[in-house]
Amino acid sequence: MEISMDLIKKLREMTGAGILDCKKALEEANGDMEKAVEILRKKGAATAEKKAGRTTKEGIIVAYVHFNGRIGVLLEMNCETDFVARTDEFKELAYNLAKQVAAMKPLYVRREDVPAEVIEKEKEIYRAQIKDKPENIVEKIVEGKLEKFFEQACLYEQTYIFDDTKKVKDLINELIAKTGENIRVSRFTRYEIGEGYED
């Protein structure tokens, strides 16, 4: 079956995938757009881990200011090409993640970003809280509490405020699968009026 350039272009606009990948997916799907999108997603999901090490020099910085003007967030989200950085889906996710930071107050982007001394301090606090428990279950309880800490303190581990069936990292991975590029939140800063001041 001959695949038209218009069909390839349409699939590329929908997915952000490369021209050759779009052509192959359409050929494999016999011109069926929905099947081609699914093929590209499966291929992208399988390669998301491979792309994690690739350089992300493009991207955007988004600013979100809560309607009352008392909370603001700057968030940097990166990708590999300016083509992906300009897509509405990329920009919308970055903006929604800035809202996530405003609402949920994470301290770190990923669990790997949490300093070892902070983790040890948290463990000490948890152990002190459960010092009367039998030794054989203390570590399990500590690990469970530490997991809850990561879910609150790390943006990627948080439940997404616009869809509580997903974590933020799931949304990042879905966009990696769709675009075929490494995508990551590099950093964010959250501001709140009066925060950090003592009289």
Swiss-Prot record:
Task: Cite the PROSITE patterns for this sequence.
Answer: EF_TS_1 (PS01126), EF_TS_2 (PS01127)
Q: Name one GO cellular component term.
A: cytoplasm
Could you state a single Gene Ontology molecular function term?
translation elongation factor activity
Keyword hit for Protein biosynthesis: yes
Report the record's disulfide bonds: none
Give the region (Involved in Mg(2+) ion dislocation from EF-Tu) as residue ranges: 81-84
Chief localization: cytoplasm
Q: Name one Pfam family in it.
A: EF_TS
Entry's SUPFAM superfamilies? Elongation factor Ts (EF-Ts), dimerisation domain, UBA-like
Q: Which residues form a coiled coil?
A: none
- Cellular location of this protein? Cytoplasm
Alphabetized UniProt keyword annotations = Cytoplasm, Elongation factor, Protein biosynthesis
Keyword Cytoplasm included in the entry's annotation:
yes
Annotated signal sequence is none
Query: What biological function has been recorded for the protein in this entry?
Result: Associates with the EF-Tu.GDP complex and induces the exchange of GDP to GTP. It remains bound to the aminoacyl-tRNA.EF-Tu.GTP complex up to the GTP hydrolysis stage on the ribosome.
Please give the HAMAP family that the UniProt record associates with this protein: EF_Ts
Would you identify the family this protein belongs to, as annotated?
Answer: Belongs to the EF-Ts family.
The name on file for this protein is Elongation factor Ts
Q: Which gene encodes it?
A: tsf
